[in-house]
């Protein structure tokens, strides 16, 4: 089972995959109190969006900084030290042992949780084979999850298709954060391993990352409300 002490609204993380700070701020205003948790990734971070993380935290929101750090240990450590001052709740690194160890050690006394990215949800077995991996997605995800837990990482970013299997491996304490969430009828886009919000929660996901189905909706606030309602129904809240 996923951790149970998370409010339904905070289980939805809206990905602010938007081109500039003004557009992102307008979307946050539009979503209002329907969303309490936001993800800032490459696109917005590199367009000057990291100050928005501080502003969101100051406004009582939670922030997930999704930069998927992957470099030599010292460089990752310095990056984590700098990013930890944003007040973010989550920070991602790629699930390589040296990277994970450096991140866990470098966060110090900050409250940021380190999440390890197992295998990107746009990858399938063929993609891994093309990249030279001997493992398929399932085996590689499992191996990386076990390493992450042993190192002391707080949670995993994984496909919702892997959530149930990983929950059986890592137990109830680790957070499972799942992108690749598509409400019924939504386009899959470039994601290959997707699931509806209700099914992902039932599979053991702790948090659901949703971007385009909210951002591109005619009424983003209503779209977010509908996903939170689906989460609540799946949990029997």
Curated annotation (Swiss-Prot):
Catalytic activity: orotidine 5'-phosphate + H(+) = UMP + CO2
Description of how the protein assembles with itself and partners: Homodimer.
Residue stretches in coiled coil: none
PROSITE patterns: OMPDECASE
NCBIfam families: PRK00230.1 (NF001273), pyrF (TIGR01740)
EC number(s) recorded for this UniProt protein: 4.1.1.23
Task of the protein: Catalyzes the decarboxylation of orotidine 5'-monophosphate (OMP) to uridine 5'-monophosphate (UMP).
Cited InterPro entries: Aldolase_TIM, OMPdecase, OMPdecase_AS, OMPdecase_bac, OMPdeCOase_dom, RibuloseP-bd_barrel
The protein, known as: Orotidine 5'-phosphate decarboxylase
GO terms under biological process: 'de novo' pyrimidine nucleobase biosynthetic process; 'de novo' UMP biosynthetic process
GO molecular function annotations of the record: orotidine-5'-phosphate decarboxylase activity
Binding-site positions, substrate: 17, 39, 66-75, 121, 182, 191, 211-212
Higher taxonomy: Bacteria, Pseudomonadati, Pseudomonadota, Alphaproteobacteria, Hyphomicrobiales
Family, per entry: Belongs to the OMP decarboxylase family. Type 1 subfamily.
Record's keyword terms, sorted: Decarboxylase, Lyase, Pyrimidine biosynthesis
Catalytic residues (UniProt): 68
GO cellular component: cytosol
One Pfam family here: OMPdecase
Pathway(s) this gene product operates in, as recorded in its UniProt entry: Pyrimidine metabolism; UMP biosynthesis via de novo pathway; UMP from orotate: step 2/2
């Amino acid at each position: 089972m996923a951790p149970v002490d998370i409010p339904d609204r905070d289980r939805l993380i809206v990905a602010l995959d938007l081109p500039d700070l003004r557009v992102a701020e307008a979307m946050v205003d539009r979503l209002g109190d329907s969303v309490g948790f936001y993800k800032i990734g490459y696109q917005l971070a590199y367009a000057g969006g990291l100050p928005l993380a501080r502003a969101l935290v100051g406004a009582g929101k939670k922030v997930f900084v999704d930069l998927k750090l992957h470099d030599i240990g010292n460089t990752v450590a310095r990056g984590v030290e700098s990013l930890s001052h944003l007040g973010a709740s989550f920070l991602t690194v790629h699930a390589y042992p040296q990277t994970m160890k450096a991140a866990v050690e470098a966060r110090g006394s900050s409250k940021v949780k380190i999440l390890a990215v197992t295998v990107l949800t746009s990858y399938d077995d063929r993609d891994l084979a093309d990249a030279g991996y001997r493992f398929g997605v399932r085996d590689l995800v499992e191996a990386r999850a076990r390493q992450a837990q042993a190192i002391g990482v707080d949670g995993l970013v994984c496909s919702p298709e892997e959530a149930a299997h990983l929950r059986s491996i890592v137990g109830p304490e680790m957070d499972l954060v799942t992108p690749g969430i598509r409400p019924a009828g939504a386009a899959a886009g470039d994601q290959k391993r997707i699931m509806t919000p209700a099914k992902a929660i039932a599979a053991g996901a702790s948090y659901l990352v949703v971007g385009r189905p909210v951002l591109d909706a005619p009424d983003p606030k209503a779209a977010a409300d509908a996903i939170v309602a689906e989460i609540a129904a799946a949990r029997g809240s």
